[in-house]
Structure formats: structure tokens, C-alpha cells
Amino acid sequence: MSRPVVAIVGRPNVGKSTLFNALAGERISIVKDTPGVTRDRIYADVSWLDYNFTMIDTGGIEPESGDVILSQMREQAQIAIDTADVIIFITDVKQGLVDSDSKVADMLRRSHKPVVLVVNKVDSFEKYMTDVYEFYNLGIGDPHPISAASMLGLGDMLDEVVKHFPDSSKQDDEDDRPRVAIVGKPNVGKSSLINKLAREDRVIVSDIAGTTRDAIDTAIKYDGKEYIFIDTAGLRRKNKIKEDIERYSIIRAVSAVERADVVIVVIDATEGVTEQDAKIAGIAHERGKGIIIAVNKWDAIEKDNNTVKQHTEKIRQILSFIPYAEILFISAKSGQRLNKIFELIDVVIENNSMRVATGVLNEIVTEAVAMQQPPTDKGKRLKIYYVTQVSVKPPTFVIFVNDKNLMHFSYTRYLENRIRDTFGFRGTALKFITRERKENE
């Protein structure tokens, strides 16, 4: 089930970052020791009641020219409209209602996306409620007073946000077609890839309008099986500032990855793996999605007998945090190896849904422990009682031990490698959870 996406929009200095940090807390999706994973706080995982969602901070995009504040607000609003299920529109009670608020409210209203209007910096409800009522003039619903800095009113605001989430459980029950996100930095050939796939022999294509983010998903039937391709291309922005475009492409990638079963990360063979490529791949890795790395423009590379090997090693070195990812060298222009994409998608989906019987799993772990003893600390040795798989997408395993503080990440990686040696889990992240139990339990 994909997570709903919530975007925060607001003028500079109204408290977007304060609200973002207040909601994210320590759950912000930054893996400190994982190379290539974005650290610039664009998105975070948030939980409220029984709901989990992804929050996107649309701030930090600077306009090239024109009215700075209004232009920036329009940029943010467009990103939110493009990517979000629900939009939090944050205003400032102390600055009051200003013209740019009204203009952006018009944009949001025309989008027909759910908008939760928030009035920030209401440190005293008794003192400021009369000023809060002024924001009814925006005509986009009830204003919700909060103080992000003091954590006041956030519960009521979140109650309103989750009311607007789509019923994704119904969607998942009704639609079991594999969903494939094509992601990558601008100009690597994402749209060309989808267009070429759509023209392949044995393919039937149809567009699906009116999805939750007003994108056009493409249904492609290949050899009698239908796949939904999610395209993050088509940046509807005139701004050419490099940092802005990169930030925007990451935001679009987050949205697409949330909805996908398999993520195809497209990189440019003529450029190699860039920092931006690594950030986007990191999003898919964090979300536990199946990953295929499509090295596009392979026809533009001069080759000898070692070219594929050398490029593969270089990619593995830079993207060392996803050693399980499948790599495919393609040309969207010529169609080279595109027929392999559907085959790989099927393999990755099958592996991402694989279950391993507890008995078989523990035979592997017992053998692995015999080959390499668990670590010790101050004379105390880690004991592994048993391992069981608890879920799929991604395959998730719980390791029961005597003291989880003794379970070093390197030993978890060792066990993961032994499990992969037996079952492969091609293109699939594996998640491990360590829990303590007493020996006689």
C-alpha cells in the first residue's frame, strides 16, 4: 500500500520548516551512514493515529526573476499540485492575510486537491482567534490555528489532514497490476524510455488520467500482462536554476516511488553515476522498493570486451548501498535491450514478494553462525535464537537475540549475504529487525 503524500506550501518566514521539523521529529528519513541518500530534508515519514504518510517540504526553491515572494509561492503551489494527495497551506497570523496568499489560494482551489488551511504563530488562541477568522476570506475552508514552535494545535490539524487521504486499500484490492516508476534526473531519457517501450512489438498502450496526482500513468500490456508505468518527466517549470531543477526532480521522484512496486532508476551512460542519481536511488532504497538501474544512451559509448564489466564495477562502487539492484544497459533511442526490461520487472516483483519458510531460514542462519561466530563485547557473546520472516515488499526478517546491543550492523550484513546466497532476492532490499528475548521464552 502506497503512502499518501502531503506537501507544505507557504510564504517565506511563515514557519514551514518549523512545522516540518515539528511533525517529522526523529522520524525524518535521513540515513546518516548510507552514502547517496538525500540529507537535505526534502521529505520525511510521519505517523498519526493509524496513518503513515510522506511529508514534502516544497520550500527552498528560488525564482529566477519577477516578484520574488509570489513567484516562489507559485512554484511551491505547482509542486504541491503535481505531487500531493493533500496540501497544507500555511499562513502567518502575525503578518495577517496578504495578496500573495490570496493568489496562491486561487491556484490551489482550481487544482481540486484537498487543502488544509493552517494559520501559524497562534501562541495564544484567546489572543489571536479574531485574527484567525480573517483567513476565512481565502475561501478554501476553515483556518486551523497552530503554533508550530510550541506544538499547539498540531493534533487537530493532523486529524483534518488524514480525513482527506485516498482509500488506497480499495485501490490496492482492485488493481494488482505491477506499478513501475521511471525516475532519474532531468534529460536522462525517462520519457523516451516509456515512449519506446510503448512502441515495442507485442505492446498495447493506454493512458490513465485522473490519478491522485493528476499525472498520466501509462498502461502497457506486454505478452498479455499489463504494467502501469509512472513517469516523473515533464517538468512544468520555466526556472532553469540547476539546484531548483534537481530539488524538483527529487520531489517528483519521492511521489512516484511511493506509488511503485518497482523503481527503474535511469542514468546517463555518457555521464556516469552522479550525486543526483545516487540521491534518487537512495529514495527507492529507503522505501524498500525493487530497483532496476537502467544505464541509458549505451549506444553512445565506445566499447571493447571489458566495457560492460568496467561500467558495472563503477556503478556498484558508487551505489554501494544498493548492491542488490539489477543493472541493465539500454538505449531508449535504438531500443537496445528494452525487451529485457519486462523480464527484469517480473523477476524483481517475484523476489520482492518472496517468503522463506522459518525452518529453512534457520538452517541457513545456523550454518552461517557456525562458519562465523557472532561478536562479543566484554566477554558477553551474541546469541541468535531464531529468525523468522514477518512480511514482504520488502521481505522483512526479525532476528531474536539475547542482547540486541551486541548485534553489529556488519554481522547483520553477513547474515543477509548468506540468505541472499541461497535465495537471491534479485533487485530487492531486505529489512532486518533485531528483538531481544529470554533464552527460555
UniProtKB/Swiss-Prot annotation:
InterPro entries: AAA+_ATPase (IPR003593), G_ENGA (IPR031166), GTP-bd (IPR006073), GTPase_Der (IPR016484), KH_dom-like (IPR032859), KH_dom-like_a/b (IPR015946), P-loop_NTPase (IPR027417), Small_GTP-bd (IPR005225)
Top-level taxon of origin: Bacteria
GO terms, molecular function: ATP hydrolysis activity; GTP binding; ribosome binding
GO process annotations (BP): ribosome biogenesis
Positions bound to GTP 2: 184-191, 231-235, 296-299
Keyword Transferase applies: no
Keyword Repeat appears in the UniProt entry: yes
Keywords from the named record: GTP-binding, Nucleotide-binding, Repeat, Ribosome biogenesis
Any Pfam family matching the protein: KH_dom-like
CDD domains for the chain: EngA1, EngA2
Residues of the KH-like domain: 354-438
Residue sites binding GTP 1 per the record: 10-17, 57-61, 120-123
EngA-type G domain segment(s): 4-169, 178-353
Family in the record: Belongs to the TRAFAC class TrmE-Era-EngA-EngB-Septin-like GTPase superfamily. EngA (Der) GTPase family.
Function: GTPase that plays an essential role in the late steps of ribosome biogenesis.
PANTHER family, sorted: GTPASE DER
Subunit comment: Associates with the 50S ribosomal subunit.
Name of the protein described by the UniProt record: GTPase Der
Organism: Agathobacter rectalis (strain ATCC 33656 / DSM 3377 / JCM 17463 / KCTC 5835 / VPI 0990) (Eubacterium rectale)
Lineage of source species: Bacteria, Bacillati, Bacillota, Clostridia, Lachnospirales
